[in-house]
Amino acid sequence: MKFGIISIFPEMFKAINDFGITARAIKDSKVSIKCFNPRDYTTDKHATVDDTSFGGGAGMVMKYEPLSQAIKDAKSTLGYNTKVVYLSPQGSVFNHNKALELLENDSLILLCGRYEGVDERLIQDYVDEEISVGDFVLSGGELPAMLVMDSLIRLLPEVLGNKDSMIEDSFYDGLLDYPHYTKPAVLPDGNAVPSVLLSGNHKEIAKWRRKQKLIRTYERRKDLIECLCLSEEDKRIINDYKIDKVSTKGEKNEK
């Protein structure tokens, strides 16, 4: 998969280029990342990429011309039909399903805004989709772009050393992940790993993990549960958990 990054801070992407799964994917030629700095497409001696906002208001706005030229250059490198995604608080919220949707593209151009954003005319002329990573404000689109890239790259075939790691990730089946434990089996204070995980019974371990995924998702993200088509067994697990919770709460109140 090929990524084109439009950013005035291309150096930031060394963090994703040089470390971890992404670095390995680049080394193995499964992914390529090329940055296009809008400052390289300016004509004034100060390499100006922003200006004041028409109508007044605080903050600067990124200029149309340098950004449009950078996008054109990126398209000439990655392909003229490459989708342009603008990382923006006004966009649809990024999630696992959106990652799978974006993964259908062989290449993507990620536009990283700064200041108060980019000239609206650039969005109208060049941007295919706006994506947000959440309802909060960041200084620019570089960190969201890295987040999106990391999410997509780990979903590519053969990028993860163990394909089961991807299948068992949170959100892969619409549920949060189950709890994980490692050595020692018992901490000095006596806090022990659930015995089923030490049993060697893979069927029981799988059942325990499924139960934990359901309970954790019900507790922390009921909105996800509501979107799933649960089996009768899954529904029973959640219902039993709710009954146990009410019963436990009642016992505490009596004390």
Swiss-Prot record:
Enzyme class: transferase
Broad class of the protein's primary localization: cytoplasm
Record field: catalytic activity: guanosine(37) in tRNA + S-adenosyl-L-methionine = N(1)-methylguanosine(37) in tRNA + S-adenosyl-L-homocysteine + H(+)
Ranges that cross the membrane: none
GO biological process: tRNA N1-guanine methylation
Key word Iron-sulfur present: no
Binding-site positions, S-adenosyl-L-methionine: 113, 133-138
One of the record's GO cellular component terms: cytosol
Function summary: Specifically methylates guanosine-37 in various tRNAs.
Protein name in UniProt: tRNA (guanine-N(1)-)-methyltransferase
